Regions:
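Phosphate/nucleotide-binding beta-alpha loop and adjacent structural elements of enzyme active sites
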Residues: 1-124
Length: 124
């Protein structure tokens, strides 16, 4: 129901207020901030190559999906296997790896939660 209400508000705002609505996929609009930097420097989307470490879900809270839709591509890395399976399916132009990056070769514990954004190697 909430999605329907949001869609109606979106359509009404475009029709009645002539607003240009740009959708952000990032959690706090980081993709739109980066996009403004790219635009001000006249960087073409096809020339953008990203490296998304800790990519998470390929759509929800994604810092790179906005650019992927515009024609950019890159490498996504995430320790959560299910996220990488989704990346490979939903974003086939990207190269996706399922591993954990760190600054040592020690074996570490990976704590997995129902909300994957909370997954961590930290006990705290």
């Amino acid at each position: 129901m909430l999605k329907l209400i949001n869609k109606i508000i979106f359509l009404l705002s475009k029709v009645f207020f002539n607003l240009k609505v740009i959708r952000s996929f990032s959690q706090e609009g980081e993709d739109l901030i980066i996009n403004r930097i790219f635009k001000s420097n006249k960087i073409k989307y096809k020339n953008i190559f990203y490296l998304d470490i800790g990519a998470g879900h390929p759509i929800r809270y994604s810092n790179t999906l906005y650019f992927y839709h515009k024609g950019a591509k890159g490498i996504t890395v995430d320790a959560h296997y299910e996220n990488i399976v989704l990346h490979k399916f939903l974003r086939p132009k990207d190269i996706s790896f399922n591993f954990l990056l760190g600054n040592s070769d020690e074996v570490v514990e990976y704590y997995k939660f129902n909300q994957p954004e909370l997954n961590t190697t930290s006990q705290d």
